[in-house]
């Protein structure tokens, strides 16, 4: 009641009209109230429609398309699990996966990207974020590598073996930074623009690669590889999902974030 009274007082002041007057025991609208009633009623209906639209997301029946920006590691490690869940539980929802690049921040701010997933230090400031899981680095090598028969590498082995360097955003800089701090220089055989081809190159050569642990498990299941422990203590890092404030309260985006957390937080 107080809120209504305050609102009515503001409207009376704005229109310079009482809007309602007492006639006998009843309150009756003034001529101005009658004149603006239809317009106000239409506006209220539209506002209610907008509110209902915001609450109407049903993942079981929705044909919504989500635009998700992912690192290439997320393509290999996370995306199949998300796709399989949607096929079973939300068969009409579609995904549009786009790469992480210099336009990602602007695309999230404009609403063109709903969610970004991966190790993305460039999105630490100015965006909402949630850690999905912690990640650490390991070395992968050919399962029949002629010189590496143990479960871990020595400092000397790591320095002397040929390496595959991956120039992907985020993780590449972690590896380089840690090795520089330790004064370790790798003998680089080849540099790859992404992680997508690293498994095949390792499998077919005697070069080794330093990659995130979860990726190594995926590659191990698909190729003739083995996983070795690093001789150095690299820090763990968080794989996160990031989103812009414009979609923070959006029901479909909230559902997607909850789903990603449920699917990936216990990897």
What are these regions (language model features)?
Residues 12-29:
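A short LG(V/I)-centered, amphipathic sequence patch enriched
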Residues 14-15, 36-58:
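Alpha-helical linker/hinge and terminal dimerization helices associated
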Residues 63-123, 192:
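Central regulatory/effector-binding core of bacterial HTH transcription factors
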Residues 78, 226-267:
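A late-sequence structural motif
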Residues 101-104, 109-113, 119, 170-227:
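Hydrophobic hinge/microswitch elements
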Residues 126-163:
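Flexible hinge/capping segments at coil-to-helix
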Residues 128-138, 209, 213, 221-236:
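Short beta-strand->loop
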Residues 147-149, 161-182, 249-253, 257, ...:
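Secondary-structure junction motif
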């Amino acid at each position: 009641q107080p809120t209504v009274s305050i609102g009515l007082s503001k409207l009376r002041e704005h229109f310079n009209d009482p809007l309602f007057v007492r006639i006998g025991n009843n309150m009756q609208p003034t001529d101005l109230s009658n004149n603006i009633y239809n317009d106000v009623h239409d506006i209220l209906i539209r506002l209610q429609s907008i509110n209902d639209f915001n609450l109407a997301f049903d993942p079981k029946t929705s044909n919504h398309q989500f635009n998700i920006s992912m690192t290439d590691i997320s393509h290999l490690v996370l995306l199949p699990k998300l796709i399989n869940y949607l096929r079973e539980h939300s068969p009409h929802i579609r995904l549009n996966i786009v790469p992480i690049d210099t336009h990602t921040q602007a695309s999230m701010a404009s609403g063109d990207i709903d969610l970004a997933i991966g190790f993305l230090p460039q999105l630490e400031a100015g965006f909402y974020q949630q850690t999905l899981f912690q990640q650490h680095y390991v070395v992968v090598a050919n399962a029949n590598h002629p010189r590496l028969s143990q479960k871990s590498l020595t400092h000397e082995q790591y320095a002397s073996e040929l390496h595959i360097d991956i120039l992907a955003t985020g993780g590449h800089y972690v590896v380089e930074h840690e090795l520089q701090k330790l004064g370790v220089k790798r003998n680089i055989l080849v540099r790859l623009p992404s992680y997508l081809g690293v498994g095949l190159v390792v499998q077919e050569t005697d070069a080794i690669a330093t990659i995130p642990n979860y990726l190594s498990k995926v590659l191990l299941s698909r190729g003739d590889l083995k996983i070795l422990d690093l001789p150095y203590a690299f820090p763990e890092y968080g794989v996160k999902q990031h989103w812009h404030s414009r979609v923070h309260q959006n029901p479909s985006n909230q559902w997607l974030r909850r789903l990603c957390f449920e699917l990936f937080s216990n990897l």
